Amino acid sequence: MDLEMDIPFHCRKNEFLIHNQFDLQNISNCEVIIGNIIISEFDYPIITFSNLEKLLGNLTILKSPDTVRIDAPIMELISGTFKMIELTSLALISFPALKWVNTLHWKILPILSNVHFNNEIKGIDNIIISDTSLTGFSGFLAESIENLDINNNRFLDTIESNVETISGELHIGANSNDVKVSFPKLKQIGLLNINDVEKLNLPELEFIDDSLILNNNNFQQLKFSKLNYIGGTLSLFENLGVNDLEFPNLNELGGGLVMINNSLIERINFFPKLKIIGGALELIGNIKEISLKNLKLVKGSAIVKSTSSIFDCKKWSKTEIMLVVRGGRIECTDSNNEKITSRTKEDGTGGELITTPTTTTTTKTNSKSTYSGGRSGGNDDVKMNKETTSSSSGCCGGNVFVNGLQHFTLFQFIAILITLVNSFVLPL
């Protein structure tokens, strides 16, 4: 941003290090500052920027336990990052004229409950708000941001934004148990990671570049009406209250489909158009029915563990799942802990089912055997096969006969000779 004006020398330098009122007074008449302001271990309750309108740099305020209030009545612009960290007594900040800031990075502000900002702030790319006492988050006009991370704000019950694109990550977690999240215009996002949320409203979301992670949430309904692609994994873990899921247009997952211990989800029939799962399929819980009618390809394994007595592993393992899994095995464990496994073939022609009962016995094998072909008996069988193989050349298997003679005594040999002589002489 080009500002054509003369800026006094004392208002221009790389860093302005401020620890007390005297340091702050040195820049009190600056309307524009070029450089980074760093306030640490400030020894007064109130920090005031009376005349500052534009800061071409970062504003960092940290580790100042005495500070309870920060005022900037006419500040319009912070071109870089507005960072506040470890201000344990801060209760209020007031920037009523602020219209532009690039990054908000607020952490460990445990009693901050009042923020007075202009409702038309633009230019924000990254927002991190963690460990505050804020009750709401809204009011930013950016159509596109890179990252939004709102976590560990124990009183925060409303998160709203009209942002349309988040190129990086949206992470929400460990805020109030009844927090309601609404992004009514969001269409595309990189990574979506939502935890501990009561309501989630994303009616326009169509495309997720990375993964969709929904863990430990309190919502009952979850609808992604327009979502058609997830580039990574779809993970739903221990969302104990959800009983109504809708993914009517989801066509492809670049990663796996993982659903674990979502107690009220008994029938997995809400992916009517899903064709491709680029990773593994893993379903664990009180599952009574699995219906993935349009599924054509699973590039990983398929693992199902059901605690419902209604679910029939044998029946499910013989369905079309045999033809679509390419990544290794199909494994299904029922409520009796009986496991059925199958090795699948890459050409989609199915595989052999193997049933493993609840209790299994271990067969002891002879570890001394080193022969890998022919019969699979003990050492005697292996030795015989080796002798037979080594004597297979030449006439009549002579070596076998010689080896056999080694086991006869002299008297047995004489008796055999007499018998042979008599057989030739007597006919004469």
Which residues make up each language-model segment?
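N-terminal signal peptide
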Residues: 1-13, 421-428
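C-terminal low-complexity, Ser/Thr- and acidic/Pro-rich disordered "stalk" regions positioned immediately N-terminal
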Residues: 328-400
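Concave beta-strand-loop units of leucine-rich repeat
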Residues: 10-26, 33-48, 56-112, 116-135, ...
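Intrinsically disordered, low-complexity polar segments enriched in Ser/Thr/Pro and acidic
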Residues: 1-5, 256, 365
